[in-house]
A protein has these predicted regions:
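Generic preference for hydrophobic
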Residues: 9-10, 33, 58, 80, ...
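Extended ligand-binding regions for polar small-molecule ligands
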Residues: 26, 106, 110-133
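Alpha-helix boundary recognition
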Residues: 29, 50, 72-73, 129
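Secondary-structure junction motif
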Residues: 31-53, 117-121, 125
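Beta-alpha-beta core module
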Residues: 1-6, 20, 27, 66-114
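Flexible hinge/capping segments at coil-to-helix
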Residues: 1-7, 11-33, 37
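Short secondary-structure boundary segments
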Residues: 13, 40, 82-85
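Short beta-strand-to-loop elements that line the ligand-binding cleft
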Residues: 35, 54-67
C-alpha cells in the first residue's frame, strides 16, 4: 500500500491543461471546480489555494467520483480528487494531472481487535496485513 495519495484534477483530453505534466493553482482560479463534500478535505484544499479559495468558482460538490467524472467529461467542471479515484476512466474521456505544489493525503485503515468478524472482513484484514509484511 502507498504511504500517501496525490491530489489531482480531472480534465477532458482536448483541454489545453491536459497537455501539462501538473496543474498549478493559478490555472484553476477561473475554472468551474467540482470539490469533494467532506469538510476536512475542503479544508485541505482551502489551505492549498490559500487566500484565493473564497473566490473559486465551485460549480458542484460531490463525493461520488463517477458523477464528478461524468460532469467533467461533459465539460461541466474540473473535479479535484485523489489520484486513481476514477482510474477506470479511459484517457480519451478524462485524464488526471497532479496538483503542484504537490498536495497529498495519508490514509489510515483501522479496525477493532478481538471481536468476531464476517468472512469478508477477515479476508480484507488478511489482505491488508499482507502489505505490512
Amino acid at each position: 500500500m502507498k504511504d500517501s495519495d496525490h491530489w489531482v484534477v480531472g480534465i477532458c483530453p482536448d483541454d489545453p491543461l491536459a497537455g501539462k505534466k501538473y496543474i498549478e493553482k493559478k490555472e484553476l482560479l477561473d475554472k468551474p471546480l467540482i470539490l469533494p463534500e467532506r469538510m476536512g478535505v475542503q479544508s485541505e484544499l482551502a489551505n492549498w489555494f490559500g487566500k484565493d479559495f473564497s473566490n473559486l468558482d465551485i460549480s458542484f460538490i460531490s463525493d461520488l467520483g463517477t458523477n464528478a467524472g461524468v460532469m467533467a467529461a461533459n465539460g461541466l467542471g474540473y473535479p479535484i480528487s485523489i489520484e486513481g479515484a476514477v482510474k477506470y476512466w479511459r484517457e480519451d474521456i478524462l485524464v488526471q494531472r497532479r496538483l503542484y505544489p504537490e498536495i497529498t493525503a495519508n490514509c489510515v485503515i483501522a479496525w477493532r481487535r478481538n471481536i468476531p468478524y464476517s468472512q469478508a472482513v477477515n479476508k480484507m484484514i488478511e489482505e491488508i496485513n499482507a502489505f505490512r509484511a
